[in-house]
């Protein structure tokens, strides 16, 4: 995990020595790669490491040609788009993909000189460090948003400041879901200029676009209703609900698919305040996520969830604070996007 071995299971010393005697053991500089579940995650063995592994779940790349390839270079190669696509395309298994030794042997990567590999590693590592820093800055701003909320309003779930409360349903003029125009009618998507938002698009706090767009014909012939500007959008069915509750506000008119819900607040609650309050309830909401055919939120329960309703003037004070934070987030996000673009370009140049 994050470049470290997470030891959850242990074997005794005698068994460890028996395995080493029979099969050898990973040495410093060898690369271990996940072969089941999340594929292609790498770990470079360190000098002080003492561990063994479950054969079949982990691929062991022994460092036999130290004069030809650096272990860190191999790790960077596994992070490249081309190698990831190769693994995805060639992974076997219906529900759980597997990356096998046979597949690994067919994998090809460019192999420059050791000196050039060192230069590539240095450049990529430096850019990765900048990307990590930018993401940390965004996280700090998100933490500041939550801290200011608690400062003004207290605990949103336990309501320790004794605010008036009401249900999500009663704080909204409308709550509705979306739909998918039939894919068997390509004319619903031709020259589409209306964003059709899915969980894949819910990566920012403010929605302005989507990967797929539909046209008015698609809207008229489906349940993908037009969503007015300044509505709250939430993902209620997706694997991402295992760990994150995506919530956003749309800055342009959009449509959404059936995995999302739209909340149009009434005059008692401001849109931004409602959006942040959902995020303050994130852990509690996700604790009730059910996995049936897909991870999903029990919607009737969500509609009956009690939210705090402070005076609108205090909500506005908080929203004004958010607008100042937004300016900082936009600047950091722009820097992150530019750095990510440079990273992607270099990875394609070196490993494409």
What are these regions (language model features)?
Residues 83-86, 281-285:
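Periplasmic-binding protein-like
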Residues 7-9, 89-91, 161-165, 181-188, ...:
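Short coil/turn segments at secondary-structure boundaries
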Residues 35, 51-59, 69-72, 91-115, ...:
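A short glycine-rich beta-alpha junction/loop motif
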Residues 1-31, 169-185, 200-229:
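Sequence-specific dsDNA recognition surfaces
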Residues 21-79, 198, 215-279, 298:
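A short beta-sheet element
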Residues 106-122, 129-179, 191, 204, ...:
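Non-catalytic DNA-recognition/assembly elements of restriction-modification systems
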Residues 20, 47, 132, 183, ...:
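Short, solvent-exposed loop/turn positions at domain surfaces
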